[in-house]
Amino acid sequence: MKLTMGLLLGSVAMFASAGIHAADLPVKAKAVEYVKICSLYGAGFYYIPGTDTCIKLGGYLRVSLALGTNGVYGAPDSGVAGARNRIRNYYTSQSRGDLNIDTRTATEYGMLRTYFEAVNTWSTGGYTGAGTSAINGSTAYTTSIASQISAGSLGVYYAFFQFAGFTIGKAQSQFASPWTNYPGNNFDGLPGGGGWEPVNQFTYTAELGQGISAAFSAQDQVANLTSNIWNVSGATAAGLATGAYGANDIGGSRAPDVVAMVRVAQAWGLFQASVAAHENHAAYYGADETTGHPSDKWGWAGQLALSIKNIPTGAGDTINMSIAYTNGASRYNFQEYISSTVAMYGGTGVPGAYQSVGLAGLSDSVFVTGSGQQLTTTYGFQGAYTHNWSPQWNSAIYGGWGAVRYNNTAKSYICGAVVTTLALSSGLAGCNPDYNYSAVGLITRWTPVNNLTFSADVTYVMLDQKYTSGSTVTLPLQSSVAKPGAAYELKDQNALTLLLRAQRNW
């Protein structure tokens, strides 16, 4: 018994000792890969663990409230906003969240970069008229509780990569200045230069030293760089009442826009010269291909941009300005956030007229059945002066002006439709579809802490139409904007809007 007990206790002690020794043996720990700061490309970059690629995450959250317009943030110059009646919005709100991802890798060919930016946006809905007659009219909200998601949208702003001097993907147009249509403003609808909206492109940029660069680009014209190609033979009373001077007769994409740009960016500021070639490719005269079509015509655009930094009025003060001229490529001056058809209503003093209206239409070209395209000319300028009152406060005064000019042949086409269809009281002698469009404004920004900014932007928009003063047209019933069929005076119009915004960048 004693022998058995001794053997049992000895066995337990042996196994216990073996367990203790095994636990005490050193074990090689798995290496921990800490995220390391990447200082090669500036603040905010980190190495992706296990790679030589640096990544930076960024974005912003923005909340806006626009007064006097149905858009955030454009002019009330068309649709229900231009109608200025009880259907329009007196305020429009919007919330937006933005995320951008920037990756960079050093290679033997230079830096390899990818950039992606997307936003989710939620905006106030609007009302449109849905009546079928002037007596039995009704109004319907564009979104209901069950379909409120229709007021939200996902947008892909940028998606491109850069390698060995090439930029491929959706990026800023090489034609546009660095500030695009925002020389100092938040207001979207400023004429006088190329716009912000990115485009798909294939671009080569040569860095020539001392801040001088040159770029050559082929870019998609479909989404943002074509306005209207009107077949005036298809003009209707309903279309003319909105500023559409014909049936929009754009054919499929045939050739990309070709852009060249030279830029000098140095400590004093920036100078840029840009040119673009734009093909106008119309569809058919009639309902099928047997009706024929006008020949293609190439248009072109040019822009000069200048930025002057650190002017004597204060540290950080800047002046940004640009001028543009186009022929058959109108979106390079009247950028994509400006309405291509304008119908703004107001009061009148003309006896027998129900109200006044300002009508205007933007195109790249116009034609009638059996004829060739007549290219539309535009020119304009924009600019802003920004003054820093303190590190927390700054203000900018800004403005833009653009002119649309139709040649005599195009005017004869358009005026034939306006006089015949809308019964223009002054006849052909009083008909002129040319117009000027301008906006001036003042914005003040307050940045109480880094990357948080509150701003107030007030803008005055003016339409200077060229029809003879006192002329009237007879417009049909327009249920969508609740306007009755009646005589309207053709008259210059204006509008005042205000944008309040809070934005936190990160």
Q: What is each model feature region?
A:
Residues 1-74:
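N-terminal periplasmic/intermembrane-space "pro-region" immediately following the signal or transit peptide
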Residues 4, 18, 492-506:
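Outer-membrane beta-barrel "beta-signal"
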Residues 35, 66-93:
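Surface-exposed strand-loop-strand hairpins of Gram-negative outer-membrane beta-barrel proteins
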Residues 40, 92-98, 156-158, 197-199, ...:
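Transmembrane beta-barrel architecture of outer-membrane proteins
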Residues 44-67, 86-237, 252-270, 308-310, ...:
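Outer membrane beta-barrel
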Residues 70-77, 126-138, 144-145, 151, ...:
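Outer-membrane beta-barrel translocator domains and adjoining extracellular loop/strand segments
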Residues 267-440:
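Detector for outer-membrane/organellar transmembrane beta-barrel domains
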Residues 470-501:
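C-terminal beta-signal and terminal closure region of outer-membrane beta-barrel proteins
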